[in-house]
């Protein structure tokens, strides 16, 4: 990939902004804004105590990581330290992944309700979401901005003109602020409404706004929204963001959850998390082992896999 693009001119004033909604607002109100704009900021979704706990739990991994240790991501600059698989490293992040508002949003957006036609009958079934990846983004001073992009490009998703339907979305992301995020220290750029664009429309930097947040808030966005990390121009300041990204259960996760999360940790996880990681089969036969649901006797299945 070519060199990273130059920073956005500091004199640029956005003509749009991201709607801010309390995390305890009615789920229908949150979903309506998400469908309209493609992204929003949920305020106060994580307590200050949990923000501190996440920072403490992940700091040892951040200290051991190298800024350039993300070879698979050529869109991430060297000034960014990424720690992968954080639901297996931070018990607090694993707990947050099961928050009611997060669970409801990912289910309402990503759960697929399907009908199968047989010779003599039809059957209805659902396929729940999966965890796509869980990561830290620690962006140091001088980190350049990313190119504007859509996250769903990893699955080769194409977008066509016509009536928009939220049911066609395949990805939903939550980026939690581990510190105060500002335009100056690299707050995520986003283009509200771009989730309804066709595949050929090219995003412009004069269409972006910035996901500026207080610690504990989250930028929630669809995989169809054009966005990108901003440029950190503040000396001695690191922008800390923690990401949880979910996909439809019919797609292959970006992060291989069977290898990213230690199996010793998996055995102690909830049924909800086992489903998100892909260890528990949905109502179809996806993910079976030995002709059955691996979650029914997970220790035995993992012992077999380790033999």
UniProtKB/Swiss-Prot annotation:
<comment type="function">
    <text>Dioxygenase; part of the gene cluster that mediates the biosynthesis of swainsonine (SW), a cytotoxic fungal alkaloid and a potential cancer therapy drug. Swainsonine production occurs via a multibranched pathway and is dispensable for fungal colonization of plants and infection of insect hosts. The first step of swainsonine biosynthesis is the production of the precursor pipecolic acid (PA) via conversion of L-lysine (Lys) to 1-piperideine-6-carboxylate (P6C) by the aminotransferase swnA, the latter being further reduced to PA by the reductase swnR.</text>
</comment>
<comment type="pathway">
    <text>Mycotoxin biosynthesis.</text>
</comment>
<comment type="similarity">
    <text>Belongs to the PhyH family.</text>
</comment>
<keyword id="KW-0223">Dioxygenase</keyword>
<comment type="subunit">
    <text>Homodimer.</text>
</comment>
<dbReference type="GO" id="GO:0051213">
    <property type="term" value="F:dioxygenase activity"/>
</dbReference>
<protein>
    <recommendedName>
        <fullName>Dioxygenase swnH1</fullName>
        <ecNumber>1.14.11.-</ecNumber>
    </recommendedName>
</protein>
<keyword id="KW-0479">Metal-binding</keyword>
<keyword id="KW-0408">Iron</keyword>
<dbReference type="Pfam" id="PF05721">
    <property type="entry name" value="PhyH"/>
</dbReference>
<dbReference type="InterPro" id="IPR008775">
    <property type="entry name" value="Phytyl_CoA_dOase-like"/>
</dbReference>
<dbReference type="GO" id="GO:0046872">
    <property type="term" value="F:metal ion binding"/>
</dbReference>
<keyword id="KW-0560">Oxidoreductase</keyword>
<feature type="binding site">
    <location>
        <position position="149"/>
    </location>
    <ligand>
        <name>Fe cation</name>
    </ligand>
</feature>
<feature type="binding site">
    <location>
        <position position="227"/>
    </location>
    <ligand>
        <name>Fe cation</name>
    </ligand>
</feature>
<feature type="binding site">
    <location>
        <position position="151"/>
    </location>
    <ligand>
        <name>Fe cation</name>
    </ligand>
</feature>
């Amino acid at each position: 990939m070519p060199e990273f693009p130059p920073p956005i001119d500091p004199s640029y004033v956005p003509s749009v902004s991201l709607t801010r909604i309390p995390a305890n607002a009615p789920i229908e109100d949150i979903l309506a804004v998400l469908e309209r704009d493609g992204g929003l900021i949920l305020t106060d979704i994580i307590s200050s105590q949990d923000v501190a706990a996440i920072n403490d739990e992940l700091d040892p991994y951040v200290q051991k990581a190298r800024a350039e240790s993300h070879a698979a991501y050529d869109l991430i600059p060297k000034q960014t330290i990424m720690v992968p698989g954080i639901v297996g490293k931070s018990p607090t992040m694993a707990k947050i992944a099961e928050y009611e508002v997060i669970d409801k949003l990912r289910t309402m957006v990503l759960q697929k309700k399907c009908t199968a036609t047989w010779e003599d009958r039809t059957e209805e079934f659902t396929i729940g979401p999966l965890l796509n990846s869980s990561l830290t983004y620690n962006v140091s001073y001088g980190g350049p901005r990313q190119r504007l992009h859509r996250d769903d490009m990893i699955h080769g998703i194409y977008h066509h003109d016509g009536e928009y339907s939220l049911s066609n979305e395949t990805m939903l992301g939550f980026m939690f602020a581990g510190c105060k995020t500002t335009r100056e220290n690299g707050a995520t750029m986003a283009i509200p409404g771009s989730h309804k664009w066709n595949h050929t429309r090219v995003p412009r930097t004069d269409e972006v706004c910035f996901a500026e947040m207080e610690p504990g808030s989250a930028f929630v966005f669809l995989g169809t929204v054009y966005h990108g990390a901003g440029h950190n121009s503040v000396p001695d300041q690191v922008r800390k963001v923690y990401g949880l990204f979910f996909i439809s259960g019919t797609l292959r996760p970006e992060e291989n959850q069977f290898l990213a999360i230690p199996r010793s940790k998996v055995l102690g996880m909830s049924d909800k998390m086992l489903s998100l990681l892909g260890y528990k089969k949905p109502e179809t036969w996806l993910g079976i082992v030995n002709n059955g649901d691996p979650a029914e006797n997970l220790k035995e299945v993992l012992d077999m896999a380790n033999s």
